[in-house]
Structures are given as structure tokens and as C-alpha cells.
Amino acid sequence: MAFLNIFKQKRGDEASQLSAKGREEISQSIKICKSDDAANEHSCSGDCKTEIEEGEQAFAKLKIEHETPLLNSSKTPKIHFVVPTSQIDWQHDACLEDPKSVQYKISQWCDKNSAKFSNVGTGKTLNCAVSSLPKDIMDIDVMRGTKNNVLILPYFIWLNDLRSDDVEATLDGLVPDLLDENISREKLLETRPNVAVARERAFVFICSHTTRDKRCGITAPYLKKVFDSKLQEHGLYRDNSDYRAEGVKIAFVNHVGGHKFAANVQIYLRNPNTLIWLGRVTPTIVPSIVEHLIVPEEPTLPFPEKVRCIKKYQSW
């Protein structure tokens, strides 16, 4: 098909941007697929195939920057706080919409304390994001924004029932413990009853922040549908009401930076504890991402030229 030929041409151009040094840097965190033709190794049928075809046609109409090498065009977080909102789009500064909200307080705390933790732990930034993950609509305080559960990555834990008035005191105590390599997960859970393990094997976040860039509002739904279809084939798909362990949650997030490299996809794997942040992701390559990176017990990375940043964190 025409879009596959266009994809192969663009992929060839992008692949040439990744130097041998860049491949070596990536391989320090994850094994790279041996095959140079990963896109043709896995495909979809039925509705999934239709979503890919329609998605590629929509993507082809968008202006995406393909000339700049992607590696190290973004920064890996030390800690990534993800706040559920049940939304797929937000105001321009998503975490700052409401000064009374949990995400506002977390964002302010991150800005205030980034320098303090600059030489502690691995990664470079303290990040707060809002997501389409579901919030508890039966809790009036959650609906007011003054209370929420917060997913903390790459630690795969939930901080439950966090109130906005308690954010500063809570994070002042919790973050140093998270960044302390001598404190185990078991000890943390024992001493903090409001902290629980996230039982997913992976989280996949797709930027859908249309208010910041309309391209993300176009690309995100297509990608999610293909991810969902492929994960269903392996029994790994989990919707918002499915809490079975060892599944994969696909969610939308707010602006992650680098919209010119749309579509941006952040993949957190629990085992090994690794973040892979990809740019210029299109529907055609999603099946290979699922089959190589998410499904296997020993993941391998297809399309290393798509990596914006990557980090293998300490397992705990």
C-alpha cells in the first residue's frame, strides 16, 4: 500500500539519523531487535487493520518534523507523578488549571524541589502529568479536585487519597524515601498505609493534549485503538473497570514536550523497570511495539531511531 511505502522511506531516513554511538547508548538500557524490518514482522487484521490504514491516512496529512535526530530530545524523569482526571484534553497548562487541585500542588512542589534532588537518584526531572486514567466520580472531594489517587512512576505505586492540603508534607517525606536505594518497596509499604502497588505490567501514555497541539488530538485516538486491539490478542488489555493484575493500561496524558515529533508515546515497563519514550510513532509500528516490547518477558526494542530518551531504573 502507498502509506507503507511512505513509511518505509521515512523510516529509512530516520534510521540513518541514529549513530552507532546512539545505538550503543540505547542498548545499555534495553536490547535492540536484531531485525531491521520489524514493521513487517507483525500486523493486524480486521478492525485493527482498518484502524492502521485510516490512521496512516490521517497521519500523512500532518506536518511532522522528520529531520532532527530524536535521541536525547527529551529528559528522563526521576519521578513521574500521574494524576487521574478522566479527561482527554486540558487547558494549556494542564496541571495549573485549578490552584486548589492535587495536580497543582504536586506541580508546584516539583518546581520548588527539583534542584534539591538534582544529585539524588537516577533520571533528570521531577514531573507531574494529568491523564485520562479514571478518577473516583463518587467522591465529592475528588470531583472538587482537592483529593485524588496519584500514580508514581517508575516505582509502580499508587499514593491513595492524597489531599491537596497534604501534598507538600507527604512528598517531603515520601520522595526522599523513593530516591533512597537502601529503602525497599516492602519497607515503604509497611510504613505508609496509603501507598499501594500498581499491579500492571506496563503503562503506555499517549499525548492527547489538543489544546496545546491539534496534531495530538488527531494522532492519539488512532494509536490507542491499535494498542488496544493488539493487547486484546494477548489478553493484556485492561479497560478502566478491569483491575486484573499483569495487564497493560493505555491512557492519554497532557503535553509531554516536543509536539513537532508527534506522536509521543511513553512506555513504562515494570520488568525490567524501564522507561522508553518514543517520538514520531505511527499506527503502522504499534503492532511491533506491542509484540517486541510489551508482550515478551525479555523485551527488545524495535525502531531504536524513534527513541527520544530511555532509562533503565533500579529494580525494587
Curated annotation (Swiss-Prot):
<keyword id="KW-0539">Nucleus</keyword>
<protein>
    <recommendedName>
        <fullName>Actin patches distal protein 1</fullName>
    </recommendedName>
</protein>
<dbReference type="GO" id="GO:0005829">
    <property type="term" value="C:cytosol"/>
</dbReference>
<dbReference type="GO" id="GO:0005634">
    <property type="term" value="C:nucleus"/>
</dbReference>
<dbReference type="Pfam" id="PF06999">
    <property type="entry name" value="Suc_Fer-like"/>
</dbReference>
<dbReference type="InterPro" id="IPR009737">
    <property type="entry name" value="Aim32/Apd1-like"/>
</dbReference>
<dbReference type="GO" id="GO:0005737">
    <property type="term" value="C:cytoplasm"/>
</dbReference>
<comment type="function">
    <text>Required for normal localization of actin patches. Involved in tolerance to sodium ions and hydrogen peroxide.</text>
</comment>
<comment type="similarity">
    <text>Belongs to the APD1 family.</text>
</comment>
<keyword id="KW-0963">Cytoplasm</keyword>
<dbReference type="InterPro" id="IPR036249">
    <property type="entry name" value="Thioredoxin-like_sf"/>
</dbReference>
